[in-house]
């Protein structure tokens, strides 16, 4: 698929892997791709050294989602134990029916969004990459624009892993996973060299930090915020330092890590994804 700057496209995603988990209750019996993405989309005019701006206009959900526990994965692995858990979660106009008693508003978002790296093929599960990937950030939602560094001609955008709702950080390693359609538009920002993704939510600029250990991830995210203020916005170093210290909030991002995991433990993250939020009202 090819798209030009400003084109709006609809990308359908699949939840077949979760259907199979529900039916078979055995991860080894799942034949569908886990965390599949739709794409790639070749964006005309995108070249290495540019940034691809992906604006999320709409996320259409189907009538259900999934709550999944994979044994040994996520922050709740110890209390959940060795048995797989799968729950089909109804979605309707009232919201997301997480339990029989608790219904919460839907807050659809894109868990996996990225462009092709210049090197080897990237995983759609973990880790997160400078070019994006399975970042699992609640900010990748309708109304936001995700900026991704382009490393290959055409950028080659892919999107997947839609969530009906997700707690920030996705500490359990899954959200309420859902099938759906993401409606996005693409633009090319010539010469905007990024070393990690950036998100404009409308109210904030969110800088994604990637590094190992977590302190390195935090430092890199803050450095990118500092470079944005002093380079793109023309602030003095002193002003940028003082305002970041006073007003830029940090938090953990998605749980997928920032470094390729040990092959013997492919779902154990290494490194960290962090987020650094700067209020646009201060620009």
Give a label for each model feature.
Residues 3, 43-46, 140:
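Short, well-ordered loop/turn sites that connect or cap secondary structure elements
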Residues 36, 58-142, 147:
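Intrinsically disordered, low-complexity linker/loop segments enriched in Gly/Pro
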Residues 108-134, 138-216, 221, 226:
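Conserved mixed alpha/beta catalytic, RNA-binding, or beta-rich assembly cores of soluble enzyme
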Residues 11, 51-54, 148:
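A generic structural signal for residues embedded in beta-strands
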Residues 209-283:
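C-terminal alpha-helical interaction appendages
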Residues 1-30:
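N-terminal, Lys/Arg-enriched amphipathic/low-complexity engagement segments
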Residues 16-27, 59-68, 154-164, 253-256:
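Short, Lys/Arg- and Gly-enriched loop/turn segments at beta-strand edges
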